Design a protein with these regions (language model features):
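Periplasmic plug
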Residues: 12
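Structured mid-to-C-terminal alpha-helical surface segments
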Residues: 2-8, 18-221
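Acidic Asp/Glu-based divalent-cation binding sites
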Residues: 15
Length: 221
C-alpha cells in the first residue's frame, strides 16, 4: 500500500498488528464490516491458529478470513493475519494515502479513501530481518521485501538498529546481529516471487546484500 502495486511483491494475504486485545480487536473489526461502506459489508471468521515447532505461541499470528460482500453478494475472501503489539510497532504508525486503490475506486465511481495507518518502516525492516535470518527459515521472499523497504526508507539507520535490537531481544530466538544463510529451496522461491524493477536477480547476491545491510545497520550509532 505504501509503495503501490507496481513496486511490490504480489501476495494474497494481509498482515496487521493490533494495538488492543485480540477479542476487542476482532469485535471492533466485525462491527465495522457489518456496518459497511458504500454498499460493501463483510463477515469475519476466526480460523485455527497454527502451532509451528519451536516458535513460542505469543509470536504466532492469529488467522482470520474476511468475507466481503457487495450489495449482499459475496465476491472474494481475504486471508488476514493478526499479530500483537510486540515492541510498540502498532503504537506509532505512518499514515499513507492509498493512491493505487483510490484510482481504482474513483474509476468505479466510489469516493477515495483517506490516509491509512501502516507499520513504520523501521519496524517492518526489523521484522523482516528477524524472519529471514531465523534458523531453517523458508522466507526467501523477505529478501525481496527488504530491498523494497530499504529503497523507501529515508531515516537514519541508527533508528532501525535500535528497533532491531529491541525486537531480537524481545523474541529471544537468534541474537542480533544475525547472519542470513539461505536454504535449499530459496533459489526457486526467490525467483518465483521476484517482481519487475531494479532488484537483485539471484538469491545468492540477495543474501549477500541483506547481510551487508545488517552490517550497515549494526554499524549505525
Amino acid at each position: 500500500m505504501r509503495l503501490g502495486d507496481g513496486a511490490t511483491r504480489f501476495t494474497t494475504d494481509l498482515d496487521i498488528a493490533r494495538a488492543s486485545a485480540i477479542d476487542d480487536f476482532s469485535e471492533q473489526l466485525a462491527g465495522s464490516l457489518a456496518a459497511g461502506w458504500e454498499g460493501f459489508t463483510g463477515a469475519l471468521v476466526e480460523e485455527r491458529q497454527a502451532h509451528p515447532k519451536g516458535v513460542p505461541s505469543q509470536y504466532v499470528m492469529q488467522p482470520f478470513s474476511v468475507k466481503p460482500l457487495y450489495n449482499g453478494k459475496p465476491w472474494v475472501t481475504v486471508d488476514l493475519e493478526v499479530g500483537h503489539n510486540e515492541i510498540g510497532d502498532a503504537d506509532e504508525p505512518d499514515f499513507v494515502s492509498p493512491e493505487d486503490a483510490n484510482a481504482v475506486l474513483e474509476n468505479l465511481g466510489f469516493p477515495p479513501l483517506g490516509p491509512i495507518p501502516v507499520m513504520a518502516l523501521r519496524h517492518q525492516i526489523a521484522q523482516k530481518l528477524h524472519a529471514v535470518s531465523a534458523p531453517s527459515s523458508m522466507r526467501a521472499h523477505d529478501l525481496i521485501d527488504l530491498q523494497l523497504l530499504d529503497k523507501a526508507y529515508e531515516g537514519d539507520y541508527s533508528d532501525v538498529r535500535e528497533t532491531c535490537m529491541r525486537l531480537f531481544a524481545y523474541r529471544k530466538m537468534q541474537a542480533w546481529p544475525p547472519t542470513i544463510a539461505g536454504g535449499a529451496e530459496w533459489e526457486t522461491a526467490y525467483a518465483d516471487q521476484l517482481p519487475s524493477g531494479d532488484l537483485i536477480l539471484n538469491v545468492s547476491d540477495a543474501i549477500s546484500w541483506a547481510n551487508s545491510l545488517i552490517g550497515r545497520i549494526d554499524a549505525a550509532r
